[in-house]
Curated annotation (Swiss-Prot):
The protein's name in its UniProt record: Probable carboxypeptidase CPC735_001200
PANTHER family: ACETYLORNITHINE DEACETYLASE, PEPTIDASE M20 DIMERISATION DOMAIN-CONTAINING PROTEIN
Cofactor(s) needed for function: Zn(2+)
Keywords in alphabetical order: Hydrolase, Metal-binding, Protease, Secreted, Signal, Zinc
Cleaved signal peptide residues: 1-17
GO aspect biological process, one term: proteolysis
Cited InterPro entries: Bact_exopeptidase_dim_dom, Peptidase_M20, Peptidase_M20_dimer, Peptidase_M20A
Binding locations of Zn(2+) 1: D173, E206
UniProt organism field: Coccidioides posadasii (strain C735) (Valley fever fungus)
GO cellular component entries: extracellular region
Active site: E205
């Protein structure tokens, strides 16, 4: 698998004007949705970048979505915007209330103030093809902005509009996918109004997938499925993803005995106990499975582990009475049950005092590697290591023959390498190419409908 990253660019940041603002300077017409070069008067780059965004249905929708802060648990406003936008464009929209996540939310605040958005044309109340992505983002909120790489200027009076860089939280993950899916769907319905297309935008993907779980457990997730294709939107560099690694989380807790650090033999250090355990755990992806390691595969490579959080002790002059660590596992093969057994065996083998060690696996969110469909021509294909909402949607096709199973595709603009960073962003060209990519996937799915 080849991995492509965006080359660093010396960007000139520009503050975004409101969509209603326009340059008062005379200028030649701006080409918004076709033609790469845009003529601009010298010294007016900022106002003309705004004009390019405002004159494109795709880019203006993406801007509106990205300007609404929607960190997980705060998706209500972006949901309201989507409902209004989709209804205005002829969709029937259902709001599916989803309770807030997490212990940090007071019980009195747990009323459903956010919701999944499920939409379909009035003529197709039972979609056969569903495009889906998520509307929540990770923190912190970073305002939407535009910039023009120096290489995008072809002279004093023109720029390469496809190179315009769009930055801000959610511009990649995953509001780019949301905007591109909507525009591709609208475009297809303009010429094929009877195509049974549906849109599903969920909350809470970044914090465990409660939104998709909620949809999956609802009557909207029909059994057997009335749909035959689901197109998931995530940043995949506009490549079709043939699968992603599985996921497993666990905690290690060690109990020690406190004592004065001048007399450590009077106590038992929980930190000294946990260190060799974590060293063993950390190496499980590099140990052959036949020797007690976690599985690897030709498709996904090695299983990887990340010891993300460590805690222990209270002061340097106290022998630590407790220590703990939290670990994430990206599974490249095998089952969740086998992975748990392997981890428990490794912890036991590295423990000096096994009775003081406890391993707890997260109650939810564990799944093996997820294989996806990649049978549509015209795409580069790759695998990814990150998790998605794909396994959170339990599609009820388990008892169907292979030819009747639901196709699942994963595709979208932008790179995961910047998705959660302070430099999150993508180009106009990335967005426009992805609309065509989604359109190609829709056409392939329509062809499947016609063959049934």
């Amino acid at each position: 698998m080849r991995v492509f990253t965006l080359a660093p660019l010396a960007l000139l940041p520009l503050v975004l004007a409101r969509p209603s603002q326009r340059s008062s300077s005379p200028q030649k017409p701006i080409m918004a949705d076709n033609g790469d070069l845009v003529m601009i008067p010298e010294g007016h780059e900022k106002s003309n970048l705004d004009e390019i965004i405002a004159s494109s249905k795709l880019l203006s929708l993406h801007r509106s979505l990205s300007q609404i802060e929607s960190i997980s648990n705060n998706e209500g406003s972006v949901g309201d915007f989507l409902v209004e936008y989709l209804e205005r464009h002829g969709f029937t929209v259902q709001k599916q209330a989803v309770p807030l996540d997490g212990h940090e939310v007071d019980e009195e605040e747990r009323k459903p103030s956010r919701f999944n958005v499920y939409a379909y044309p009035a003529s197709s109340p039972s979609p056969e093809i569903i495009l889906t992505s998520h509307i929540d983002t990770v923190p912190p909120y970073i305002p939407y902005s535009l910039s023009l790489p120096p290489t995008a200027s072809t002279g004093s009076s023109s720029i390469d509009r496809r190179a315009i860089h769009i930055s801000g939280r959610g511009t990649v993950d995953a509001k780019a996918s949301v905007a591109c899916q909507i525009i591709a769907t609208l475009s297809h319905l303009e010429s094929n109004p009877d195509t049974p297309l549906g849109l599903l935008f969920v909350v809470s993907e970044e914090t465990g997938g409660q939104g998709m779980h909620h949809f999956s457990n609802s009557p909207l997730n029909t059994s057997p499925p009335t749909f035959h294709t689901v197109i998931f939107g995530e940043p995949t560099e506009s490549k079709l993803v043939s699968g992603h690694k599985g996921m497993l989380h666990f905690d290690v807790h060690v109990r020690g005995k406190p004592a004065h650090s001048g007399y450590p033999w009077l106590g038992r250090s929980a930190v000294s106990e946990i260190l060799p355990i974590l060293s063993k755990v950390d190496s499980l992806g590099d140990i052959p499975e036949s020797e007690g390691g976690l599985p690897s595969s030709e498709k996904y490579g090695k299983t990887t582990l990340n010891i993300g959080v460590m805690e222990g002790g209270v002061a340097t002059n106290v022998v630590p009475a407790s220590a703990s660590a939290r670990v994430a596992v990206r599974l490249a093969g095998g089952t969740v049950t086998h992975a748990k057994e392997t981890i428990l065996a490794a912890v036991r083998s590295a423990s000096k005092n096994p009775e003081d060690v406890h391993v707890s696996f997260s109650a939810g969110g564990a799944y093996p590697p997820v294989d996806l469909d990649s049978d549509v021509e015209g795409f580069d294909v790759m695998t990814v290591n990150y998790g998605t909402d794909v396994p959170n949607w339990d599609i009820h096709d388990h008892d169907l023959p292979d030819h009747g199973k639901v196709k699942r595709y994963l595709y979208g603009p932008g790179s995961i390498f910047v998705a959660h960073g302070e430099n999150e962003g993508l180009s106009v060209g990335d967005m426009e190419d992805a609309v065509e990519g989604y359109a190609r996937l829709i056409r392939a799915a329509v062809g499947r409908s016609e063959r049934k």
